Amino acid sequence: MSQIRAFLAIDLDDDLKPKIHKIIKEFKQIDADIKYVDLQNLHFTLKFFGDIDTDGIDLISSKIENVIKDFDSFNIKIKGCGAFPNTNRIKVIWVGLDEDEILKNLHDRLDKEFNSIGFDLDKKYSSHLTIGRMKSAKGKADVKKTMETNKTVDIGTMEVNTIILKKSTLTPSGPIYEDLIEYRL
C-alpha cells in the first residue's frame, strides 16, 4: 500500500495569472526573504488531506461526487491582498476572495463528508491564493506597505466549474502538483 500527499483544489484561471504576477513582481522589488509560488501552481485549496493511502482515493472520490451533484458552476470574485496569521507576524502572503456563500457552502459540505471517513474538520476556512511565504522578518515593513497598497486590489472574476483532486510531491525546489481526478460542477 503506497501513500501520496493529496489535496482538493480549484485552479486559478489562466487569464487572471498576469494580474497576480504583477502583484508578485511588486513584492519581488523588496529586499525580503520570500519564497514565491510558481504561477502554474496557483490554486484555492478546498481540503488538504495530507498523506493518504492510494487505496482510499476511491472513497474520497465518492464523497466528492456525493457533494458536488448538488452544485452547479458559480463565479468567484478575486480581490485583496493580506497575510497569515496577520500583518505583524507574516508567514503567508495571499490574495483573497470576496466572501462567497456558494464556495463556503461547498467547502463545509465537503468537510463534513470527509469528516465522516476520518478526516479532521477544518478549524476555520478562509479561501485564499497563497502567492508567497516569508522565511524571515527581513523587509517586513516594506512587505506590509506593499500589502497595504494591494489591500483592495481587484484581480477579477472567474467561473468555478471544476474541482481537482491533486497529488503534491515535495522537492527541494518546491512542490510539484499532479492532477489526479477532475470533477465537473
Predicted feature residues:
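Histidine-dependent nucleotide/RNA phosphoesterase domain, centered on the 2H-phosphoesterase fold
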Residues: M1-L185
